[in-house]
Regions:
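Long luminal/extracellular ectodomains of secretory-pathway precursor proteins
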Residues: 20-179
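Positively charged n-region of N-terminal signal peptides that target proteins for export
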Residues: 1-4
Length: 179
């Protein structure tokens, strides 16, 4: 009789564990994905009239924060140079231009979660993104006869089913939000 009771108890625990595992799997499987959408613009003043125009054909990357460490190092390098009170402005500008060019070359080589390109209206979209973590969004484009465009934003932790909308500006410095 004690063996029968022990056997039935063991089977009951095993059945309960299987039921819990099935319930947990069902709950985990139903977490809706998040999405990140945005629009990239540039503010311009032409003949004393301020306008906003979309930034077309900007390559936009979505990264997990841990994969952007080399980019963050380039941001920090430029920020440290700008923070020096007795720094030579020309030398600081040159150092930041080099870091910007390196960032432009680096970003496409980093492992991205997703990529997109802005359309004619400057919009982009990342769908079916895993929630529960923050992301880094970095947009790059070769500059016409000048420095490349590098736009950076850090998202908050995405919630399940969240649809995050971003308004990005080419006018923001690439060293802006330190990642």
């Amino acid at each position: 009789m004690p063996k029968l009771f022990a056997c039935l108890s063991w089977l009951g625990m095993l059945g309960g564990a299987a039921l819990f595992a099935g319930q947990a799997k069902r709950l985990v499987g139903e977490v809706p994905p998040a999405s990140v959408r945005g629009r990239v613009i540039v503010f311009e003043t032409i003949n004393r009239k301020a306008t906003t125009n979309p930034v077309r054909d900007l390559q936009v990357y979505l990264f997990k924060p841990e994969t952007t460490k080399p980019f963050v190092e380039l941001q920090s390098k430029c920020r440290r140079a700008m923070a020096q009170p007795k720094a030579d402005p020309v030398q600081t500008y040159h150092l930041c231009e080099i870091a910007l060019a390196e960032a432009f070359e680096l970003v496409p080589t980093l492992p991205a979660v997703a990529t997109a390109k802005t359309g004619a209206d400057g919009s982009f979209s990342f769908e079916n993104i895993a929630p529960g973590r923050p992301y880094h969004v970095i947009g790059i484009k070769a500059g016409k006869g000048g420095s490349p465009i590098v736009i950076v934003v850090k998202t908050a932790r995405l919630r399940p089913g969240q649809q995050l909308s971003l308004e990005l500006s080419e006018n923001e410095p690439w060293t802006g939000p330190i990642m």
